[in-house]
Amino acid sequence: MKLQISWLLSFFLSMNVLAETKLFVLGTGTPNPDPQRMGSSYLLLVDEQPYLIDFGIGVIRRFSELTEEWGGELKIDTTSIDHAFLTHMHSDHNLGLSDLIITPWIMGRENKLKLFGPDGLDDMAENIIKAYEFDINYRIYGTQPQNKTGYKFEFKKIDENFIFQDNNVKVEAFKNNHGDLEESYGFIFKTDEIKIVFSGDTAPSEELVKVAKNADILVHEVYSQSGFEKKTKDWQIYHAAHHTSPMELGKIASEVMPKKLVLSHILYWGASSE
């Protein structure tokens, strides 16, 4: 089997998995404030139903750029976003939550946002709503014709037994290996025809290798070896325990044998992207 590898150096990439299923990488960024890369975020579109996996900074703007309203090709808009899955509670994966809660509602979303993630995500969402209470009340009770539901959310905590299923997809969570962070997960998305696995932030993970076998697409994080070697020893220890080197990822890919390997959340630390 020939392994295809996609390096994600632009701000988003679209892959037509099937005619009715598309994967868009909205952001490949990290905590480093690279102006060319938005925060970690992925859009899986199945029969015109969007599912977000992580929602780093810039997620709504990148999503909007794909829509017909803002010059793209997708016929949906931000009001369609009502399912979002979070791998873990690190800020580079959830800084876009306030935008995800507020902006689609302002644009007309009436459905509650369905949030799936670790402990703490519900508290974060509640606190965002509290922080924007003035703005929300102004829009509802002022002269704007705004609905009273679209900024609200429903939360379901994920664990290694988590399963979500609707008419389009089945989603399962698995524990990965993000150092000393206990609640850190990857996701398996399955339709009738395809299997897409998102590693989340992780060092090499035996569980990932097991569940990702023969995936159609494996989206996996990686760091630059040359950038890593420039870090101080304490940071090298940290990153080696929390993330995946190119050599380690090559071994993972040879065991999993996905049809396509997509590299994301790429930690360069000033190294060249070449």
Give residue ranges: language-model regions.
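Binuclear metal-dependent hydrolase catalytic cores
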Residues: A19-V197
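Positively charged n-region of N-terminal signal peptides that target proteins for export
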Residues: M1-I5
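Alpha-helical structural signal in soluble globular domains
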Residues: F11, T103, I128, I252-E255
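Cap/insert and terminal regions of metallo-dependent hydrolase folds
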Residues: G186, K195, A203-E274
